[in-house]
């Protein structure tokens, strides 16, 4: 009998694989600006830090602009990509000055933003901003992550996306992940 999972479990497995792969490829620090849409991302980072504190350090800053510049400073100091995690809506916009600075200074940053599911885009739902090309030409790559469905290929995709993000973050990358709670 096949094992069934919930959307939250599918998302948790997806983002856990994503963070595990980022760490494997050299990301040692994550700065989280907590918010409801990025809960799965924040929890995956925190849980990985708890399991492997020698491999990952997670910082929390409720001010998105300050968090982004903290991440920028950490990346400048280490020369390694730092991941920034924020929720949807205008939180993403508050990272913009640091993203521009990262591009100008050639500092490796990876922005991971939570988002509403695609079916709520463009309908006036709160905390919904068109994230496609939100940073314009200031990032090397943008990828909208699919909604995980609990398939093995979802995990493979998460790992591939993480590798590509780290490799592209020789400067700057932005990935958007959909929040998948039952109470949309």
Regions found by a protein language model. Give the residues of each.
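Thiamine diphosphate
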Residues: 2-88
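Conserved small/polar residues in nucleotide/adenosyl-binding loops
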Residues: 173-180
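Hydrophobic or amphipathic alpha-helical targeting/insertion segments
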Residues: 100-118, 138
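Active-site-proximal loop->helix
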Residues: 73, 117-134
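Hydrophobic/aromatic ligand-binding patch that stacks against planar heteroaromatic rings
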Residues: 70-74, 98-101, 134-135, 168
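Conserved thiamine diphosphate
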Residues: 80, 128-172
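Short acidic, glycine/serine/threonine-rich loops at helix termini
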Residues: 41-45, 72, 95-97, 121-125
């Amino acid at each position: 009998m096949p094992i069934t999972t919930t959307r939250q479990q599918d998302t948790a497995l997806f983002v856990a694989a994503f963070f595990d792969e980022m760490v494997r490829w050299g990301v040692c620090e994550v700065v989280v600006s907590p918010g409801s849409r990025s809960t799965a991302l924040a929890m995956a980072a925190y849980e990985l830090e708890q399991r492997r504190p020698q491999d990952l350090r997670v910082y929390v800053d409720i001010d998105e602009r300050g968090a982004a510049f903290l991440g920028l400073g950490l990346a400048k100091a280490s020369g390694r990509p730092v991941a920034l995690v924020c929720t949807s809506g205008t939180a993403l916009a508050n990272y913009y000055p640091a993203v521009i600075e990262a591009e100008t200074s050639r500092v490796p940053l990876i922005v991971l933003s939570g988002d509403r599911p695609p079916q709520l885009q463009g309908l006036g739902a709160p905390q919904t901003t068109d994230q496609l090309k939100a940073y314009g030409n200031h990032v090397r790559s943008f990828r909208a992550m699919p909604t995980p469905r609990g398939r093995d290929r979802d995990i493979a995709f998460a790992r591939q996306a993480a590798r590509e993000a780290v490799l592209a973050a020789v400067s700057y990358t932005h990935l958007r992940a959909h929040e998948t709670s039952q109470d949309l």
